[in-house]
Amino acid sequence: MATTADFKNGMVLMIDGKLQQIVEFQHVKPGKGPAFVRTKLKDVVSGKTVDKTFNAGVKVEQATVDRRDMTYLYNDGSAYVLMDDKTFEQVELQPELMGDGAKFLLENSRVNVSFHDGQALFAELPANVDLKIEHTDPGLQGDRSTGGSKPATLETGAEIQVPLFIETGNVVKVDTRTGEYLSRVTQ
């Protein structure tokens, strides 16, 4: 059992027989009345989000979640295949569990997968990855009509917006959560 004081983003709770992950939370102490905690919870199975308010100090059942470090091997078209780093067991994950950031994964990338009762719940990808630019148009000096960015295709096939000074062959750091360019990587 956990109390509202133990809440953290990413924590998985068992509420009304359903696994709910805390997306965000806020402790609120109004000037009048008791303190409470506002949360945004995501149903791990269906993916739906719901807002729920708890009184401060309320005990909530925390789900036992086993987090395992895994290595991304390949995508067979219908599922992502990962290997457990300790047992070398291969696991197939559906695209919904990997999220939108999966398009930035290279083979042998590290992924943290959470399991409950042997069933994969969700995957946490690295916050950012370094990827090579496979193709982008040359940025011309003084070309500011496009707002200072241009499309670029990464080595994974994903397309992002990059600044005009980025060229084909450069390595860039990409945020896997938002798909945005962060910086150029110098080697």
Swiss-Prot record:
Keywords: Cytoplasm, Elongation factor, Protein biosynthesis. InterPro entries: Elong-fact-P_C, NA-bd_OB-fold, Rib_uL2_dom2, Transl_elong_fac_P/YeiP, Transl_elong_KOW-like, Transl_elong_P/YeiP_cen, Transl_elong_P/YeiP_CS, Transl_elongation_fac_P. The lineage of its organism: Bacteria, Bacillati, Actinomycetota, Actinomycetes, Mycobacteriales. One of its GO terms (cellular component) is cytoplasm. The keyword Cytoplasm applies. This is Elongation factor P. Pfam families: EFP (PF01132), EFP_N (PF08207), Elong-fact-P_C (PF09285). GO terms for molecular function: translation elongation factor activity. Its main location: cytoplasm. Belongs to the elongation factor P family. Involved in peptide bond synthesis. Stimulates efficient translation and peptide-bond synthesis on native or reconstituted 70S ribosomes in vitro. Probably functions indirectly by altering the affinity of the ribosome for aminoacyl-tRNA, thus increasing their reactivity as acceptors for peptidyl transferase. Pathway: Protein biosynthesis; polypeptide chain elongation.
